[in-house]
Swiss-Prot record:
This is Nucleotide-binding protein Achl_1824. Belongs to the RapZ-like family. GO terms for molecular function: ATP binding; GTP binding. Displays ATPase and GTPase activities. ATP binds at G30, M31, S32, G33, A34, G35, R36, S37. The keyword ATP-binding applies. GTP binds at D81, V82, R83, S84. The keyword Nucleotide-binding applies. InterPro entries: P-loop_NTPase, RapZ-like, RapZ-like_N, RapZ_C. Keywords: ATP-binding, GTP-binding, Nucleotide-binding.
Length: 307
């Protein structure tokens, strides 16, 4: 947000400067129907502390409270919209007070074309907050006039016309996630069929086609985490080919999850008891999947030790 004119406005209005804020501060505003709620949800999902529908005059008070909070709040997002009615006119003065106090912040302005905004309001069967007794377009026009100066001075203007909910959430994540685009988190879980399927599994691989180390006396006491069992399992005919093909089959799934803004999935690998074959294959599968960009993998063994 530009500082010079805002700072002079703050001085003229006599607003008290706030204590310097250590948290990263993002002010989210924009046109009604442009996706503020979706943006707020996406920010909250990725570690931001989100305050919605805050009157602009309370920005300084909130910053002061956060600066004295006993528990650190590293990233704070504040959503402001025209439902604050008359108080919205004070937003530049409030932002000016923050700038004058040395608080670093960014302003995200969400926008969309008139046609898209009208369609969204009609689909939601709700009136525009500024239309009064007129048309939705009348409310949009009034809001554009009210927000034009703020839009022009915002740090980021994001046109959401071409986004659905998932696409907008992904765009927000890529803009404001601490580490850029969020990773897809995969949990590769070994299990034993005799104990039942994992209820939270998205995909299940059945590896009972592999010769069972249980019937090899020297391997029976060991598990798939031990090298002798792992070598026995992975060197069996067709196993490495199976793992490679399974990973290839998951590639379009991983891409689709990213497009749909899905961040978690569980891939279950099962054998009879969850001790030998599934454990070894789950470890190998995890190594392969971890090589993909923007993927983090954890490996768990649900039934290891149950026997």
């Amino acid at each position: 947000m530009a500082g010079t004119s805002a700072e002079s406005e703050a001085g003229q209005d006599g607003m008290e400067p706030v204590k310097p804020l250590e948290a990263e501060l993002l002010v989210v505003t924009g046109m009604s129907g442009a996706g503020r709620s979706t943006a707020a949800d996406a920010l909250e999902d990725h570690g931001w502390y989100v305050v919605e529908n805050l009157p602009p005059q309370m920005l300084g008070t909130l910053a002061e409270l956060v600066s004295h909070a006993p528990q650190s709040i590293p990233r704070l997002a504040v959503v402001i919209d025209v439902r604050s009615k008359g108080l919205f006119a004070d937003i530049r003065a409030a932002l000016g007070a923050l700038a004058a106090s040395g608080v670093t912040f960014r302003v995200l302005f969400l926008d969309a074309s008139d046609n898209v905004l009208v369609r969204r309001f009609e689909q939601g069967r709700r009136p525009h907050p500024l239309q009064g007794g007129g048309r939705i377009l009348d409310g949009i026009a009034a809001e554009r006039e009210l927000l034009q100066e703020l839009r022009d001075s915002s740090d980021v203007v994001l046109d959401t016309s071409g986004y659905n909910v998932h696409g907008l959430a992904t765009a927000i994540t890529e803009l404001f996630s601490e580490t850029g685009p969020v990773a897809l988190r995969l949990n590769v879980m070994s299990f034993g069929f005799k104990y039942g399927l994992p209820v939270d599994s998205n995909y299940v691989a059945d590896v009972r086609f592999i010769p069972n180390p249980h019937w090899v006396p020297q391997l029976r006491p060991h598990t798939g985490l031990d090298k002798d069992v792992s070598d026995y399992v992975l060197e069996a005919e067709g196993v490495k080919n199976f793992v490679d093909r399974y990973v290839m089959a998951l590639e379009p799934v991983l891409d689709g999850y990213r497009r749909e803004n899905k961040h978690y999935a569980t891939i279950a690998v099962g054998c009879t008891g969850g001790k030998h074959r599934s454990v070894a294959v789950a470890v190998e599968l995890s190594k392969k999947l971890a090589q993909y960009p923007r993927v983090t993998v954890t490996t768990t063994h649900r039934d290891l030790g149950r026997e």
